[in-house]
Amino acid sequence: MWWLAGLAALLLFAFPYAERTRNASERPRLLQGMALVDTGSLAIDGPGARGLATGPDVARDPLRGRLYPNKPPGAGLVAAAAYAGARGLAAATGEPLTLRRYTWWARLLAGVLPTLLLCGWLARRFAPELGARRMWLALGLYALATPAFAYAHLLYGHQLTACLLTLGAALVVDGCRADRPLRAALGGGLAGAAVGVEYSAAFAGPALAVFVLSWARRGRWRAAVGALVGAAGPLTLLGLYHASVYGGPLRTGYHHVIDPTFAAKHGEGFLGLVAPSWAAFHTHLLASEGGLLWWAPLAPLALAGLWDMSRGTGDSALRSHARVQLAMFLALVLACASLNFEGGWRVGPRYLVAVLPALALGWGRALAWVSEHPLRVGLFVALMTWSLVINGLAGDLWPHLDLTNIHQPVSEVLLPLWRAGRTPYTPAGVGITGALIAGLLGLLILLRPGPRAAAIAAGLGVAAGLGLVAATALFAPHPRGAANLAYIERVWEPPPDGAAVSAILEPLSR
């Protein structure tokens, strides 16, 4: 559990927050949480909103004209729990509740805690088969050196979705294999709930359904029924929400977005899902601004590990898990390659974040190949260092990059902020460099390069990884890059003289 405590410390160390940015993905969920607690309504344009701007990511109820988040309500429900807790704590201490403090609690419940729960559960489940040290290194890579680190700092719902979907799929696999209906039902319920947080989780459904049906044919029909019944529960509730707000169980907020640009995009194909295209594939996997291979270049190694496990001899549980996780990952890749929009403010490919935990399982196998071979160790450590540094800078400093006016976010945003000594809200205002070093040292300790040659290769790998980060300066900056950075610096919190003023969320008079 010491490694989990270390992850918790690094995830909680920094609170990157700038109230004036009005984060379009977070603000509607925050307003929905407030409205639900204060007024009992999920609409965000009533008195519970307290006059705060909703941003563009909203939809209009065609029946009554009310405004709602254009996303499913799952993250808003978690935000409501955070708001109720923060409101109760404020009442107990006599301090006013601010939007900043409420946001911290919401991000804790919807970002940090799901990430820690996911890592702890995966370690307990797979460490006996893959080795504790190797599994914790894989989980460290996932939590610190992929975009999961940035989204753990936000109320986007991506980490909550990843936790629900991954745990749900794993419980379904184990439940079906052992013919345990209750476990399968719990797994189905968690996987179904993931769709209630993020619609894109539904694209993982066919892979899981194929597995369930294949085991039903082997006689595990009780578990198969359990999984289907479990999934039906949250999906039915989501359909009832859609019917109540938008007039039909299959009518979503995306059908009724109020922003004209969003409406045009979602009006193409099936809510913006069109035929696969090279442009979309490049955007989500290859582009230096937000592609997977830039923000998690060790992903191919993990996919190779999943492929190797999925082809294993015998009928092991690991093989089943690897097949399901690999299939879900590839299904989301195909969905991303078919989107006609890029994802707004983001770090890396945000629509793949729900299935990034699959990489942890793949690394759990593939790390055995790194072994003590100096060349492999050096290359691995170089890419690990690069990944940890850029994801750490993004997650701790500015986890919602608007790539409209950016060619290379590392050189145009993250490194300039770090060089200028910009520090988010941290304990005693301590800078983030120490946290980055601590994370890198932790991963190196878990890697434990053995012979002298491998240790030297690891040291050279660290230097090479840092060199890669510095080399991003070779990218030609966007013509509007300087203006974009100036805006970030203008709204930066905390200012030099302490905490910025935050909106006070006064209790509503009954």
Positions of PLM-derived features:
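Short helix- or helix-capping micro-motifs
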Residues: A9-L10, M135-T146, T166, A170, ...
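Membrane-interface transmembrane helices that cradle and orient dolichyl/undecaprenyl
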Residues: H158, G168-A184, S310
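Transmembrane-helix motifs of polytopic, lipid-linked glycan transferases
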Residues: W105-L130, L167, L171
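Membrane-interface alpha helices of multi-pass inner-membrane proteins
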Residues: G33, A138-L139, A143, R183-E198, ...
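Membrane-lumen/periplasm interface segments of specific transmembrane helices
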Residues: A223-G305, A322-C336, W386-N405
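Hydrophobic, aromatic-rich transmembrane alpha-helices
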Residues: C119-L122, V210-L213, L293-R319, R323, ...
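Perimembrane helix-loop-helix junctions
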Residues: D174-R177, F203-L235, G239-L240, L303-A317, ...
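Transmembrane-helix signature of polytopic, membrane-embedded enzymes
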Residues: W2-A5, A91-T98, C119-L144, A162-C163, ...
